[in-house]
């Protein structure tokens, strides 16, 4: 009798994706982040669903409904903090996953890479809208500032902003539609993740050497399922430590004050995972220029396949490029720090220098370094 998992139309798909999938025999731990992102997405959808059962998307009751979840709902505090800190874990893994892609040259899988960048934009939009929902001070003012950026678009800007707000300011209509979008987007993200995997399985996985590994493949199960479970255990431990010991470590104290349109917080800033982009936005004195630079700072990821001048795919055997990539990582950490600082003398200059160096490293230094390495290797 033939095996059901190999013949059943539905189970067959799962079998070809997670069980009998031929994978390179020597991919590093860095390749674990994809599966962890999948787990994070499922966690976010489940916790979000339970939160939505108790949350009310109305300006008068949104803040108190979140308080009610934390105080009165069975394990509501756990669900709420798992959702909030789960989002932080999601972004940590997203950035690691992108970094891994840059290090090993995975961006040469054009379709997989491009849908990945679109996924990043979608996840960022979802996280931003989720941050607005508790209707605290930072939620309200964050929503006001970020949506207001669209007014920089010539001609249609102001009309577009009012259309998104559903009025002349961030109010009940804005909160209701943000809740609707925040609810539907994770399911769209799930569909896009499936397309992401579909494109990946068309070409097969990359590996640290960057060479073709068709001659040396092993089944995904049990080798990589066990490896993924190890990553899952480490993630669960970290997330539980965060939720149970310091749930508000990555949050903003201002969000424990209900939204007040008459009182602006001294420093408006988004969640920590957007700070690098926020720092780039603030470092440009012009509004439209800042918005364009903000979009380009993420969109530039799509340029990597075009900017790849090296004869080798991976950075494993390219020490100079490795060095530059780590400088880029340090630069992004500096930008994240600057994004959380007030707009004052030393921070403005540091932010501007870090923003310029961010674009210079990617657009100029990395391609030139790759060409130099080609020359040194006599290629």
UniProtKB/Swiss-Prot annotation:
InterPro entries registered for this protein in UniProt: Cyt_b/b6_C (IPR005798), Cyt_b/b6_C_sf (IPR036150), Cyt_b/b6_N (IPR005797), Cytb/b6-like_sf (IPR027387), Cytochrome_b (IPR030689), Cytochrome_b_C_euk/bac (IPR048260), Cytochrome_b_N_euk/bac (IPR048259), Di-haem_cyt_TM (IPR016174)
Binding-site positions, heme b b562: 83, 182
GO cellular component, one term: mitochondrial inner membrane
Cofactor(s), by name: heme b
This protein's record includes keyword Electron transport: yes
Compartments (UniProt record): Mitochondrion inner membrane
Keywords in alphabetical order: Electron transport, Heme, Iron, Membrane, Metal-binding, Mitochondrion, Mitochondrion inner membrane, Respiratory chain, Transmembrane, Transmembrane helix, Transport, Ubiquinone
Cysteines paired by S-S bonds: none
Binding of a ubiquinone, residues: 201
Keyword Metal-binding: yes
Pfam families in the cross-refs: Cytochrom_B_C, Cytochrome_B
Ranges annotated as spanning the membrane: 33-53, 77-98, 113-133, 178-198, 226-246, 288-308, 320-340, 347-367
Gene Ontology process terms (BP): mitochondrial electron transport, ubiquinol to cytochrome c
Main location: mitochondrion
Record GO terms (molecular function): metal ion binding; ubiquinol-cytochrome-c reductase activity
Positions that bind heme b b566: 97, 196
Cofactor binding mode and count: Binds 2 heme b groups non-covalently.
Function: Component of the ubiquinol-cytochrome c reductase complex (complex III or cytochrome b-c1 complex) that is part of the mitochondrial respiratory chain. The b-c1 complex mediates electron transfer from ubiquinol to cytochrome c. Contributes to the generation of a proton gradient across the mitochondrial membrane that is then used for ATP synthesis.
Quaternary state and interactors: The cytochrome bc1 complex contains 11 subunits: 3 respiratory subunits (MT-CYB, CYC1 and UQCRFS1), 2 core proteins (UQCRC1 and UQCRC2) and 6 low-molecular weight proteins (UQCRH/QCR6, UQCRB/QCR7, UQCRQ/QCR8, UQCR10/QCR9, UQCR11/QCR10 and a cleavage product of UQCRFS1). This cytochrome bc1 complex then forms a dimer.
Family indicated by similarity: Belongs to the cytochrome b family.
Additional detail: Heme 1 (or BL or b562) is low-potential and absorbs at about 562 nm, and heme 2 (or BH or b566) is high-potential and absorbs at about 566 nm.
UniProt name for this protein: Cytochrome b
Organism: Clyomys laticeps (Broad-headed spiny rat)
